[in-house]
Swiss-Prot record:
UniProt KW keywords: Aminoacyl-tRNA synthetase, ATP-binding, Cytoplasm, Ligase, Nucleotide-binding, Protein biosynthesis
Protein's name in the database: Asparagine--tRNA ligase
HAMAP family, per database record: Asn_tRNA_synth (MF_00534)
Catalyzed reactions per annotation: tRNA(Asn) + L-asparagine + ATP = L-asparaginyl-tRNA(Asn) + AMP + diphosphate + H(+)
GO BP annotations listed: asparaginyl-tRNA aminoacylation
One GO term describing the cellular component: cytoplasm
Gene: asnS
Location (main, coarse): cytoplasm
Disulfide bond as UniProt keyword: no
Sample GO molecular function, one term: ATP binding
Length: 448
């Protein structure tokens, strides 16, 4: 096969021309003298149509029959080179169709396990390496790719430098009970749960930094929003106020949504995502509400007919039902700010005049998707941070490098982190986070 190949996504530029595409057979149908072949190549799905009389006219009676029979006998996921004339077709969701003139089999496929019928989740997860080939899973991966692309673009445009934090560490950024431990040449080491502590060093050197990579949390959680291995974007910046940080986070999330609308509109269409809702999240300002005001709101509405959450007092942490109600109440992504210090990380800076609250924020996504961003201002005073660590009984020797940052020219600084899979799930409108990463790692799943 020596013809130049094009991608399915580019066929719009070749209307009326004969092209060759390398693809897999997603499905086929037809009867008699016509065959419909659903093709995919990773960029899009596309329908090819083969007419038996056309093959006989072009190749003769015997060869025409043989070539058409090859198409009729194609199995799902057979790989092919398919040649044909690109035609516009208003009936097609893609807008185009291929009038097949030739087809060459590259690799046979027999008894492909994921047939067009319905399959259970466990079966699909056991065959995740194949499930990724399906239309909806491909769409989710395209949305993930668009979000990653938009992340790098946004931080580059806003003066941030990519700063790679280590995966292996001897200390915890947050809850030490959620760490995966491994042996490091006879010493205990832990897989990173956040690059934040190292990013703070980066911010003191470079001003504005971000990292993007896998993190690990040994949470024994079975919810639809938790993975034990996921990809995290952490950003850290010097000389930025709490309000400026919230502005930056809002601009970032809006840039991610816009990036998907621009780069993966067909994926949103495949997933039947409410695009108008996504556009509204871009155009309308995000809401900001204090933790204490949010608790008061929850208390005022807990007797409402449509509420389904437990009573909370000031000082209690939100559960998923509370987060869902808050974001749905406001109808747009909502920042809840200034949580109690009692259940937040040791490094968060207290609210001036109110040491029981810290300068932090969680961004809650509407439609039941919950927290997608967590961020805070960091305690920049050495003595105050040491006192907090002593109060919590922490071993300061494990954080000597972190404390050094407060001894040599400390400045106001803060940061935030976003789990990419949660953002993908929200933008894609899918129900479970396991579909937002190629090979999910969960409490009872470590293969394939």
């Amino acid at each position: 096969m020596s013809k130049k190949l094009i991608s399915i996504v580019d066929v719009k530029d070749y209307v009326g021309q004969e092209v060759t595409i390398g693809a897999w057979v997603a499905n086929k149908s037809g009867k008699g003298k016509i065959a419909f072949v659903q093709l995919r190549d990773g960029s899009a799905f596309f329908q090819g149509v083969a007419f038996k009389p056309n093959f006989i006219e072009k190749y003769g009676e015997e060869s025409g029959h043989e070539k058409f029979d090859v198409i009729k006998r194609l199995n799902q996921e057979t790989s092919v080179y398919v040649t044909g004339i690109v035609k516009e077709d208003e009936r097609s969701k893609f807008g185009y169709e291929l009038d097949i003139t030739d087809l060459e089999i590259i690799g046979e496929s027999h008894e492909y396990p994921i047939t067009p019928k319905e399959h259970g989740t466990d079966f699909l997860m056991d065959n995740r390496h194949l499930w990724l080939r399906s239309r909806k899973q491909m769409a989710v991966m395209q949305i993930r790719n668009a979000i990653i692309y938009a992340t790098y673009e946004f931080f580059d445009q806003n003066g941030f430098i990519k700063f790679d934090s280590p995966i292996l560490s001897e200390n915890a950024a947050e809850d030490s009970t959620e760490l995966f431990e491994t042996d490091y040449f006879g010493k205990p080491a832990f897989l990173s749960q956040s690059g934040q502590l190292y990013l703070e060093a980066g911010a003191m050197a470079l001003g504005r930094v971000f990292d993007f990579g896998p993190v690990f949390r040994a949470e024994k959680s079975k919810t639809r929003r938790h993975l034990t291995e996921f990809w995290m974007m952490d950003a850290e910046y010097s000389f930025l106020s709490h309000e400026e940080s919230l502005d930056l986070q809002e601009a970032y999330v809006k840039a991610l949504i816009q990036g998907v609308l621009d780069r993966a509109p067909q994926a949103l269409d495949i997933l039947e995502r409410d695009v108008e809702a996504l556009k509204r999240y871009i155009t309308e300002p995000f809401k900001r509400v204090s933790y204490d005001d949010a608790i008061t709101l929850l208390q005022e509405h807990e007797a409402d007919e449509d509420t389904d959450y437990e009573h909370l007092e000031h000082g209690d942490d939100f559960g998923s039902p509370h987060e869902t109600w808050i974001s749905n109440y406001f109808g747009v992504p909502t920042f809840v700010v200034n949580y109690p210090a009692s259940f937040k990380a040791f490094y968060m800076k207290p609210v001036p005049g109110n040491p029981e609250r810290v300068l932090c924020a969680d961004l809650l996504a509407p439609e039941g998707y919950g927290e997608i961003i967590g961020g805070s201002m960091r305690e920049d005073n050495y003595d105050t941070l040491v006192a907090k660590m002593d109060e919590l009984g922490m071993d300061k020797s494990e954080y000597d490098f972190y404390l050094d940052l407060r001894k040599y020219g400390s400045v106001p600084h803060g940061g935030f982190g976003i789990g990419i899979e949660r953002m993908v799930t929200f933008v894609a409108g899918t129900k479970h986070i396991r579909e937002a990463i190629p090979f999910p790692r969960m409490l009872h799943r470590i293969r394939p």
